[in-house]
Regions:
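Short, acidic/polar
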Residues: 67-77, 143-152, 262-270, 326-328
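Acidic/histidine-rich catalytic cores of soluble enzymes
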Residues: 55, 84, 127, 186-320
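Conserved, mostly hydrophobic/aromatic
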Residues: 60, 77, 85, 117, ...
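Catalytic domains of carbohydrate-active enzymes, especially glycoside hydrolases
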Residues: 73-91
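N-terminal secretory signal peptides
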Residues: 1-11, 38
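Active-site acidic/histidine proton-transfer and metal-coordination neighborhood
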Residues: 19-30, 35, 43-45, 50-52, ...
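Glycine-rich, proline-tolerant flexible connector loops at the mouths of alpha/beta enzymes
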Residues: 88-112
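Twin-arginine (Tat) signal peptide motif
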Residues: 8-16, 29
Length: 375
């Protein structure tokens, strides 16, 4: 199936939402005015003048280029007109282009490293250290917690305001040895395990991690809503933010929300109005309808080299959803006052890192120009 031929689910949802709105107004006249006000508010957001919208920088997340030296990567990004970078500092992204220890040990090296990007008009916008600092394996938990702490210290030194990572996932109890991702509270023991995870592991860890970040001038910890971690959707993100504080926000990677049937624009509006979006990965998802119909969307256990059994897979921007959908998404980020960057992440199993990133940049730049009325 050609990914571009996948049906546009948003138009169908828009139709159903409009139909439901009208039906509700007829069935409950006393609520019609409130529903009309909601519709008017959404319409007003869609009619914001381009002149008032921020030109959000378009950047790249560096793990897509593991075989390039830092200088080679900078040369390539400069040739492509990349405006910002998200740099891995350890954990799952590795630290291929960032010698963390050297930069922490020598302030002059840190200044020179950052200047290397800035001399090519590339902003070092974000440091990323995705890991599992609440792992039931104490060695993994301490390793990833230390990676987070060192990333905070490096961000402080470099003047970077945003750190990206995962919430992590504990085991199901104090004697467990492997993580246990729980999304359903029944049978009863699963609900008990979930409560234990949040009360005993997740909230205590992130309270102290946020305190450490705050003490070093870092006030934006962008957690990626990702399967297999306790923060995997907007609701769990907001739960942790409420428990820990406003240092916790979202790395809004919509590729993980599309398969959960989230409406991307609604997610951006909801989180954006709370000032809870700190970072945005730009990555797409395509669905294989026959497999969705047969197996549903919780169909991840397939060989990434054989997509014949997959219900969905990551794609470069524009290869899962249309450019018009991405226009709505990018405009929504602008309308809610998002202050970060658009960071292209390539995990496309079909396109190489270089091809996937370059094609995503092409789509995003053209869509941004169309929104802002620029060239």
């Amino acid at each position: 199936m050609d990914p571009k031929s996948a049906p546009n689910s948003r138009s169908r949802r828009d139709f159903l939402a409009t139909t439901s709105l009208l039906a509700a107004a007829v069935a409950a006249p006393r609520t019609a005015s409130a529903l009309t006000a909601d519709a008017a508010s959404a319409s007003a957001e869609e009619n914001v003048s381009p002149s008032t919208l921020r030109r959000i920088p378009i950047g790249v997340f560096d793990p897509a280029f593991p075989n390039l030296s830092t200088d080679e990567m900078i040369d390539k990004f400069a040739a492509w007109g990349v405006e910002a970078v998200e740099i891995g500092t350890g954990g799952y992204p590795n630290s291929t282009h960032c010698p963390v220890k050297d930069l922490l040990d020598d302030p002059a090296k840190a200044r020179a490293w950052k200047k290397n990007f800035e001399d090519r008009n590339i902003q070092v916008a974000t440091l990323s250290c995705h890991g599992n600092p609440v792992s039931p394996d104490p060695k993994i938990a301490e390793r990833d917690a230390e990676t987070f702490r060192r990333t905070v210290l490096l961000a402080e030194r470099l003047g970077v305001s945003v750190i990206v990572g995962f919430s992590g996932c504990p085991g199901g109890g104090p004697t467990e040895t492997v993580p246990n991702w729980i999304t359903y509270r029944w049978p009863t023991e699963y609900g008990q395990m979930l409560d234990w995870q949040w009360k005993e592991k997740v909230i205590p860890y992130w309270k102290q991690a946020a305190k450490f970040a705050r003490e070093h001038g870092i006030h934006k910890i962008a957690l990626e809503m990702h399967p297999n971690f306790v923060v995997y959707n907007p609701k769990t993100l907001l739960r942790l933010r409420e428990a820990v504080g406003e240092e916790i926000g979202a790395n809004c990677d919509l590729s993980h929300l599309f398969w959960q049937q989230c409406d991307a624009v609604e997610v951006i509006r909801m989180l954006g109005k709370q000032g809870a979006i700190f970072h945005a990965h730009m990555k797409d998802t395509t669905f294989y309808k026959n497999n969705v119909d047969r197996y549903g969307v919780l169909n991840f256990a397939f060989d990434k080299n054989d997509l014949s059994g997959a219900s969905e897979t990551f794609r470069a921007v524009g290869y899962g959803h249309s450019a018009s959908t991405w226009k709505e998404i990018m405009r929504a980020y602008m309308e809610v006052g998002y202050q970060g960057i658009f960071s292209v992440e390539n995990e496309d199993p079909i396109l190489s890192g270089e091809v996937g990133v370059e094609r995503a940049l092409y789509v995003l730049k053209n869509v941004r120009n169309e929104i802002l009325g620029t060239t």
